[in-house]
C-alpha cells in the first residue's frame, strides 16, 4: 500500500472531535494568552490543557 493512502486514524478521529470541544479549547487559549508574560514560570495552563484533551478523548471513545 502506498504511503499516501495511509491515514492516521487517531489523528482523523481527534480532528473530527475538535469542533465539539471548542469551549475548553478557547479556555486553554485564553489562559495561555493571560500568562504569556509571566516570567516567574509559576503560572501554567495544565488544567485547561487536560480539560481540552479530556473532551477530545471522550468524543473519540464514543
Curated annotation (Swiss-Prot):
Family classification? Belongs to the UQCRH/QCR6 family.
Q: What does this protein do?
A: Component of the ubiquinol-cytochrome c oxidoreductase, a multisubunit transmembrane complex that is part of the mitochondrial electron transport chain which drives oxidative phosphorylation.
InterPro entries from the UniProt entry:
Cyt_b-c1_6, Ubol_cytC_Rdtase_hinge_dom, Ubol_cytC_Rdtase_hinge_dom_sf
Q: Which domain of life is it from?
A: Eukaryota
Gene3D superfamilies reported for this sequence: Ubiquinol-cytochrome C reductase hinge domain (1.10.287.20)
What gene does this protein come from?
QCR6-2
- Name of the protein in its database record: Cytochrome b-c1 complex subunit 6-2, mitochondrial
Q: Which UniProt keywords apply?
A: Disulfide bond, Electron transport, Membrane, Mitochondrion, Mitochondrion inner membrane, Respiratory chain, Transport
Subunit notes for this chain?
A: Component of the ubiquinol-cytochrome c oxidoreductase (cytochrome b-c1 complex, complex III, CIII), a multisubunit enzyme composed of 10 subunits. The complex is composed of 3 respiratory subunits cytochrome b (MT-CYB), cytochrome c1 (CYC1-1 or CYC1-2) and Rieske protein (UCR1-1 or UCR1-2), 2 core protein subunits MPPalpha1 (or MPPalpha2) and MPPB, and 5 low-molecular weight protein subunits QCR7-1 (or QCR7-2), UCRQ-1 (or UCRQ-2), QCR9, UCRY and probably QCR6-1 (or QCR6-2).
Q: How does it sit in the membrane?
A: Peripheral membrane protein
Any one cellular component term from GO for this entry?
Answer: mitochondrial inner membrane
Pfam families named in the record: UCR_hinge
Q: Does the keyword Disulfide bond apply?
A: yes
> Which GO BP terms sit in this record?
mitochondrial electron transport, ubiquinol to cytochrome c
Residue stretches spanning the membrane: none
Q: Where in the cell is it found?
A: Mitochondrion inner membrane
> What cystine pairs are annotated?
17-59, 31-45
Amino acid at each position: 500500500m502506498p504511503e499516501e493512502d495511509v491515514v492516521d486514524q487517531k489523528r482523523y478521529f481527534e480532528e473530527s472531535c475538535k469542533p465539539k470541544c471548542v469551549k475548553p479549547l478557547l479556555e486553554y487559549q485564553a489562559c495561555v494568552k493571560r500568562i504569556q508574560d509571566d516570567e516567574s514560570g509559576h503560572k501554567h495552563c495544565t488544567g485547561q490543557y487536560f480539560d481540552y484533551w479530556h473532551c477530545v478523548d471522550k468524543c473519540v471513545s464514543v
